[in-house]
Amino acid sequence: MDKPVTFAICGLGIRGLEAYAAFQKQHPEKMKITAGADPDPDRRAALQANYGVPAGSCFATGEELLAQPRLADVMIIATQDRQHVAQALAALDKGYHLVLEKPISPLLDECLALQKKAHEANRVVVVCHVLRYTKFYGTLYELLRGGAIGRI
């Protein structure tokens, strides 16, 4: 890889800043964050201070970010669940590949619309299930597998 893949992050909460953005610190040769959006000014300031994202590339809403020309190769959508589909569809319209936090949507029609748009745009959409690899879920799995609450 000659240069890192660029990312814009919609939603700078625990997932956006601590799960996804932190990867840049571990692998700067693979990932560069170029823009972000969050209603909390302290989170935007953290993105600027910790990841070198210019103030002009930090926005108060995902909609403001998505109104810009495309600022990265990939859009990470880690906003509130109810915002996922609209932001994902808008990001695909801009030509972004997507890393999409779960849930995509509780509605099958919206999931199918997103799948269709991604196919038409020839874009990759990855839906994340990152917690399944945490120690908490591993312990829970072992307890259930061992019959701690009976047969499931």
Give residue spans per PLM region.
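Conserved G/P- and acidic residue-centered "switch" motifs that form tight phosphate/ATP-binding loops
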Residues: 11, 102, 147
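Alpha-helical structural signal in soluble globular domains
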Residues: 22-27, 47-51, 90, 94, ...
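A contiguous active-site-proximal alpha/beta segment in oxidoreductase catalytic domains
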Residues: 105-152
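N-terminal Rossmann-like dinucleotide-binding module
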Residues: 1-53
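Beta-loop-alpha module in the N-terminal Rossmann-like domain of NAD(P)-dependent dehydrogenases
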Residues: 53-117
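Short, well-ordered coil/turn segments that N-cap beta-strands
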Residues: 31, 73, 96, 123-124
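Short loop/turn motifs at secondary-structure junctions
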Residues: 30-32, 52-54, 71, 148-151
